[in-house]
UniProtKB/Swiss-Prot annotation:
Source taxonomy: Bacteria, Bacillati, Bacillota, Bacilli, Bacillales
Protein's cellular compartments: Cell membrane
Entry membrane topology: Multi-pass membrane protein
Assigned protein family: Belongs to the cation diffusion facilitator (CDF) transporter (TC 2.A.4) family.
Transmembrane segments: 14-34, 82-102, 115-135, 158-174, 176-196
Record bears the keyword 4Fe-4S: no
Name of the protein described by the UniProt record: Uncharacterized transporter YdbO
Gene: ydbO
Organism: Bacillus subtilis (strain 168)
Main location per the UniProt record: membrane
Length: 290
């Protein structure tokens, strides 16, 4: 129940992102086109992909709230990971389009100097998006949402991209018009890099990948439990923002079945309490070490 409430809180951050990105995308695209800034136009297209990514996060958070059923005995938590994967494809497509546009402008030797209005628009956007990043970062940390944290990091990247657009446009005022399309090209690279990072993390999670170093805290917790002789095996996987763990422990072979079951319950309770894990399955075996 607590996890569902946290997912609902996460929707606020996703909705805030959508609202902010819609406004910024429209403003940047209009000003970028009217005042001849390739960098600001690229930044606006970047925000357009962010709208899609934020909508995907919102949809994923809502689907993830559905309870487990006969077809999904572990719940629907992976919906937010799937939505992130879809968003990464769209972001990559737009990033490539920006790269092509910036590359053509560089090759064409553009001499058109953007208006300073484009520079101030980019600077204002950078400050605004960094504020959005700080808000969503705090919210994501409080509700332990990896999807919202990823969205927050994307907002931080957007702030840096907008700052880069400001530098590009401002440099054009110093009789360096080539800096603007070069900045647009760099923005395209940043969009593609962000898309790749999201794709890599989402695909790793969906294929049940789990970094070995992240298992250490769980091993340390089990190691402190008195009646556990050995942690024979431990595996974990992500289902959305939740963690599911399976482990095999050994206990004194003289323990009764009921006592062994009690040790397993103690392990489950400590793992869930100390690490906010959703599901823990513990298999108990008699210790055969003499």
């Amino acid at each position: 129940m607590e996890r569902t409430e946290n997912l609902k809180k996460g929707e606020k951050g996703a909705l805030l992102n959508i609202f902010a990105y819609v406004i910024l995308a429209v403003v940047k695209l209009v000003i970028g086109i009217l005042y001849h800034s390739e960098a600001l136009r690229a930044d606006g297209l970047n925000n357009g992909t962010d709208i899609v990514a934020s909508v995907a996060v919102l949809i994923g958070l809502r689907i993830s709230q559905r309870p487990a059923d006969s077809d999904h005995p572990y719940g629907h938590y992976r919906a937010e990971t799937i939505s992130s994967l879809v968003a990464s494809f769209i972001m990559m497509a737009v990033g490539i389009e920006v790269l092509i546009g910036g590359g053509k402008a560089i090759a064409g030797g553009t001499t058109e100097t953007p208006n300073l209005i484009a520079a101030w628009t980019a600077l204002g956007s950078a400050v605004f998006m960094y504020g959005i990043y700080l808000y969503n970062k705090r919210l994501a940390a409080s509700i332990k949402s990896s999807a919202l944290m990823a969205a927050a990091k994307d907002s931080r990247s957007d702030a840096f991209v907008s700052a880069g657009a400001f530098i590009g446009v401002f440099s054009s005022q110093l009789k360096l018009p080539w800096v603007d399309p070069v900045t647009a090209f760099i923005i395209g690279i940043i969009i593609c890099k962000t898309a790749w990072d999201i794709f890599k993390d989402a695909s790793h999670s969906l294929t049940d990948g789990f970094h070995l170093k992240d298992l250490e805290p769980y091993k340390q917790t089990v190691g402190r439990i008195e009646n556990v002789h050995r942690l024979k095996d431990v595996k974990a996987r992500y289902l959305g923002s939740t963690v599911h763990i399976e482990m095999v422990i050994t206990v004194d072979p003289k323990l009764t079945v009921e006592e062994g079951h009690g040790v397993a319950d103690e392990v489950e309770d400590k793992i869930k309490h100390e690490h906010d894990v959703t599901h823990v399955h513990v298999h108990v075996e008699p210790d055969d070490i003499k």
